[in-house]
């Protein structure tokens, strides 16, 4: 299997992050998670084709990079994007990833996570701008395997 095909397979499980752009019925909402006192922002994600750069040993290896730019939807509207990168630390696809959610006319939310191939990712919210200038919290990204997924960001009050 070629590097690009392998990168596509890995990236499908990578994150905030990374399959063929496909449209399906979008859904998203913003609500309160009363059990933890956090405000939850939920988005339908349309993953893009990732860009894979093989910088280390040929094939997956330390120093390889994947960059992504995905669309975030709320209802039937695109409300922002998710952009970022993952740097591989070994041939298994274990990666250090970081990204930024940009919500149109609202600001940004920065996040980071350790990536492995499972479709469920746990994110740390590390900051933001605009309406999210004091953003802290955590979140999840779940990939559906069809080029779509769900991003949930739980912001501390």
Q: Residues of each region from the PLM?
A:
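Targeting-peptide/extracellular-domain and disordered-appendage signature
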Residues: 2-13, 17-157
């Amino acid at each position: 299997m070629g590097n690009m095909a392998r990168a596509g397979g890995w990236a499908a499980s990578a994150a905030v992050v990374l399959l063929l752009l496909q449209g399906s019925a979008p859904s998203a909402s913003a609500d309160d998670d009363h059990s933890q006192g956090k405000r939850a922002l939920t988005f339908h994600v349309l993953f893009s084709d990732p860009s894979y750069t093989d910088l280390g040993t040929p094939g997956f290896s330390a120093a390889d990079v994947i960059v992504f730019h995905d669309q975030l939807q709320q209802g039937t509207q695109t409300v922002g994007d998710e952009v970022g990168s993952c740097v591989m630390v070994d041939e298994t696809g274990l990666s250090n990833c970081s990204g930024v959610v940009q919500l149109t006319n609202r600001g940004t939310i920065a996040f980071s996570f350790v990536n492995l191939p499972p479709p469920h990712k746990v994110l740390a919210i590390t900051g933001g701008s605009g309406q999210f200038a004091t953003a802290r919290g955590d979140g999840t990204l779940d990939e559906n395997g069809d080029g779509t997924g769900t991003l949930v960001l739980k912001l501390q009050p």
